[in-house]
Amino acid sequence: VIYLDASALISLVTGRPYALELREFLAQSPEMPMGTSTIGFIETVRTLDRVGTYPTAMHDLLAAFTEILVTDEIRDWAASLPGGVRTLDAIHIASAQAIGDELAFLVSYDKRVLDIAHSVGIPIAAPGMGR
């Protein structure tokens, strides 16, 4: 599973910086499932509402990405992550962590998310960002 946080989803949908590199990265494993937390769907749609008109965003995201529900385990992992990470970002990291051995990468364009995810042993990727 390739987990995308909201920063990656927004780049992918809007064509923001690194969108081309992200599309190329994802195209390398077309059979690999992609997922995000329930929080990822909400964050992405709320941001898209502010930056443009994307009337089918939620439908499109739900069709392309597996939704990872916030469980007690994810809640507890998110609460116990090292300091320096925002609440929603902690939920993304914990959601990726919950995928376990099936997780190929957590994709993000947020340096704090990448640093903390890496520090707890999660494989990370930021295609085009030079990490």
Report each predicted region and the residues it spans.
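Short active-site oxyanion
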Residues: 30-34, 63-66, 100-105
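N-terminal interaction/assembly modules
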Residues: 42-45
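Alpha-helix capping/helix-boundary segments
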Residues: 8, 40, 74, 92, ...
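Acidic catalytic patch
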Residues: 63-94
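Short, well-structured N-terminal submotif of metal-dependent ribonuclease cores
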Residues: 1-36, 47-62, 121, 128-131
